Amino acid sequence: MNSFTYDYPVRNYFGEGAMDQALDAEMGAMGRTVMLAYGGGSVKRTGVYGHVVDKLTSAGKRVVDFGGIMPNPTYEKCQEGAALAREEQVDFILAVGGGSVFDCCKVVSAQAMLDEDIETFEHADGKMPSSFIPMGCIVTLSGTGAEQNNGAVITNEETHVKGAYLGAMPMWAALDPALTLTVPHAQFMSGAFDTLSHCMESYFGSPRGRNVTDDINLAIQRNVIRNMRIIADDNQNLEALSELVYDSAMAENGVLKIGKSTDFQAHMIQHQYGAYTHTNHGMGLAVIHPALYRHLAPEAPAQFARWAREVWGVDAKGKDDLTVALEGIDRLQTFIGEMGLPTSFAEMGSDASDETLHKVADTCVLTGGCAKKLERSEVFQILTECL
């Protein structure tokens, strides 16, 4: 393992009633003016929005509404939120939803405290914000684990770049699995695959020998797969939903990255594909992973073979590591189809042109943590194999 320092500041409230437990415990630290941030209308239809507003107003808080945060949140939306937070002198940001809402609010929290544009501050000047409006998260859609860290992925619609930002670290997160019962099935499965993707991208980093971080990772992957299969048959199974909500948190709270240099190449490709096509993140990952891994497995056959044996139950007797690895990738792709997720861009309803695929390949970040650093020509080849 690599050397590391691990500091985990997010306070988690998990289980039935976690939302109220968190609000009651944290209300005193929220200040007078609370920005309530959310996505579309689902939080209002389910009653979560009204319940949270009632709790806040009953405690004497002034509520500032910041809704309409879209999937794949835009830089413009983040700037809108930051301007509102400054204008209303917001003391606390309460983000209700999933990864897109949380990512947007992390950037809002930082931008509201900066005198200059955060994109220039971070990307051009290489500086990191140090002052934030404090924030908390209520999870109604799991999968991204975004409530567990300070990373954010934001789309700049002018440049078609889906870029990474560092914003606020949430002070706390409420994870009540019952709040995910109303999530549409396809959307939930997409989020669950994002969790599996986070695990795989951490596992396939380096070092590639056996270590306790990878042991934990492979166990979580098995748990995600087992519970996705349960949800595929019974999407109201609260126990399986609970497992997947916690799996999502574990995948992104840093535990699976301890002592590792991670590989997030699939995410980098999907980020740019999504920036150009506005397609669903988790579904795009489901399409990209098998194609990408068929290119990476020959460079790290032992690592892929272990994953194939321990996660997918591939019988390795009489087979070399690469054969075992490729069989594991085939099982991953079969599983994706069984879960009702797409196995090609065409199944997603996406028909990107060669020109678009070249733009994606030419602009996506190439990571150095995976089995090999891809050339852009190979990224284009992978994308064509996803069609």
Predicted regions and their residues:
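Short glycine/serine/threonine-rich phosphate/pyrophosphate-binding segments
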Residues: 19-22, 44-48, 75-78, 100-105, ...
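A glycine/threonine-rich phosphate-anchoring loop and its flanking beta-alpha core
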Residues: 10, 113-212, 306
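Active-site segments that bind and position negatively charged phosphate/pyrophosphate groups
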Residues: 202, 206-331
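Glycine/serine-rich anion-binding loops at beta->alpha junctions
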Residues: 90-106, 140-146, 276-279
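Short Gly/Thr/Asp-enriched flexible loops that form oxyanion-binding sites at enzyme active sites
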Residues: 51-52, 80-82, 101-115, 148-151
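C-terminal charged capping/lid subdomain of soluble metabolic enzymes
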Residues: 304, 311, 315-387
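ATP/NTP phosphate-donor binding region
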Residues: 1-92, 345
